[in-house]
């Protein structure tokens, strides 16, 4: 049974992670997580101490659990790009500090690193307004560059063709014919999937209510540093991981909001695109890194249709749109121990598949503490 430990600074509670109900489960991994959470309280998404918090949590997990695979994920640069008008000197300080703390973590542990910058950010050029369509539409709180049309009417397509900022329109039928996705993925696809030009953000039902100052660029390549093997494509990262884990401890360090322009290590540019779709620092980006499979081989599309069955019986209530925990992620490899830490919330436990994952419990910048997820036994 998967278990969640929620730490709200003054109290902790243990829940059945699948149902959300209170649990009295006990185990060595639960004890480890409870001790670590109790000693390090999450300072908030926009606080630079969140970088230190991430590193301290990772060091504690390394000391107490001794995993062979460690995910360390930093969201701070992303938060400061999207939600703040960050001056250039302040931005440099943030990026320098993330890489300084990364170096410290690697210096005091025995991990061989794979360091990934998920991509540069750009100023918003304009908004693509969907409210004037006659059909139903969906935006995505996690993907600024994708949207979907549900139950469309033909004249919507004429309007879409004339909208500034839309780069691609692909029908559900064409998508399925081209990519042969899983049935679960196909079931959730909208009638039409839309993607935006660089700098354009979709606005509509499901988009973020907070004002964004920057959004992910059209990052056709992202920086990857590692001495463990050649990484030409984003799907190569998992292959390099698997090979190295046969005889080494590996740390996969992921830094959001940092691309080729600001990366502080020597790097090889890694292909970050498949056909018309460019990964944009959403959960699909992480899942592709962790599984070695492109987004259309997962179960949740970039913009997902809501289904009646999702609400008939709600499961994994702390996992956002994910109604399952993938079993093909790197952390689910049966022959290794794995752990993950992130100051991004909701999806790190999903995408890492780690035995123990500690992540921030903040929603839309509102800090409610931190949460540890103890995964099902392998």
Where are these regions (language model features)?
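Feature captures the catalytic ectodomains and active-site-proximal regions of enzymes
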Residues: 1-378
């Amino acid at each position: 049974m998967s278990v969640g430990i929620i730490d709200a600074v003054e109290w902790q509670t243990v829940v059945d992670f699948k149902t959300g109900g209170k649990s009295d489960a006990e185990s060595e991994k639960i004890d480890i997580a409870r001790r670590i959470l109790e000693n390090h309280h999450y300072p908030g998404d926009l606080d630079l101490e969140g970088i230190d918090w991430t590193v301290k949590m990772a060091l504690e997990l390394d000391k107490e659990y001794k995993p062979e695979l460690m995910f360390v994920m930093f969201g701070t640069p992303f938060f400061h790009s999207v939600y703040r008008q960050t001056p250039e000197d302040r931005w440099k300080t943030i990026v320098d500090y993330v890489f300084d703390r990364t170096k410290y973590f690697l210096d005091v542990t025995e991990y061989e690193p794979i360091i990934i910058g998920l991509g540069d950010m750009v100023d918003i050029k304009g908004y693509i307004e969907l409210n004037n369509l006659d059909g139903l539409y969906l935006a995505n709180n996690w993907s600024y560059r994708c949207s979907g049309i549900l139950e469309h009417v033909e004249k919507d397509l004429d309007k879409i063709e004339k909208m500034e900022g839309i780069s691609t329109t692909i029908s559900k039928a064409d998508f399925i014919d081209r990519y042969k996705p899983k049935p679960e993925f196909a079931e959730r696809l909208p009638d039409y999937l839309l993607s935006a030009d660089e700098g354009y953000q979709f606005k509509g039902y499901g988009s973020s209510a907070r004002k964004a100052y920057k959004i992910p660029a059209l990052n056709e390549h992202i920086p990857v540093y590692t001495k463990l093997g050649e990484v030409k494509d984003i799907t190569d990262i998992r292959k390099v991981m698997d090979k190295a884990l046969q005889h080494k401890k590996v740390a996969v360090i992921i830094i959001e909001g940092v691309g080729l322009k600001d990366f502080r290590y020597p790097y090889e540019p890694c292909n970050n695109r498949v056909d018309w779709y460019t990964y944009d620092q959403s959960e699909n980006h992480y899942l592709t890194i962790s599984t070695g499979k492109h987004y259309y081989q997962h179960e949740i599309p970039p913009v997902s249709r809501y289904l009646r069955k999702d609400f008939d019986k709600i499961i994994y209530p702390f996992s956002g749109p994910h109604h399952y925990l993938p079993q093909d992620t790197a952390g689910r490899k049966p022959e290794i121990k794995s752990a993950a830490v992130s100051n991004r919330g909701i999806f790190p436990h999903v995408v890492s598949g780690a035995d123990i994952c500690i992540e921030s419990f903040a929603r839309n910048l509102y800090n409610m503490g931190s949460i540890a997820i103890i995964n099902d036994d392998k």
